[in-house]
């Protein structure tokens, strides 16, 4: 079963990330075997409306880097992109992050649900 310890790990990851966009994210918890995840997946529901997102046009490097899916270098690259001559403080489309060498397609897919543009 899950038990108190593993339940606490799930809650901790959910809190740190700002919610889950996929039940498959539970596989990121090292101390919970895939066999247990496979058993509980049918009972898990995900509420995308409750995801906590970060506005990339108004967040500092420190705030961006606070998210576990964003490295310091990625946070700095987002900030620098926002303030380059073309953007003048405003990124218009999240997909622009794919033009940064700091973001692989995989990195972007993992983090995009936690980012927003206001």
Where on the chain are the PLM-derived regions?
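Compositionally biased linear targeting/interaction segments
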Residues: 1-118
């Amino acid at each position: 079963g899950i038990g108190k310890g593993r339940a606490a790990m799930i809650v901790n990851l959910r809190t740190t990330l700002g919610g889950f966009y996929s039940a498959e994210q539970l596989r990121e918890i090292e101390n919970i075997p895939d066999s247990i995840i496979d058993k509980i997946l049918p009972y898990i529901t995900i509420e995308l409306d409750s995801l906590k997102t970060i506005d990339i046009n108004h967040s500092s490097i420190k705030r961006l880097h606070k998210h576990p899916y964003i490295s310091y270098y990625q946070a700095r690259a987002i900030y620098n992109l926002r303030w380059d001559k073309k953007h003048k403080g405003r990124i218009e489309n999240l997909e622009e992050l794919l033009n940064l060498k700091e973001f692989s397609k995989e990195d972007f897919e993992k983090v995009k649900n936690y980012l927003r543009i206001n």
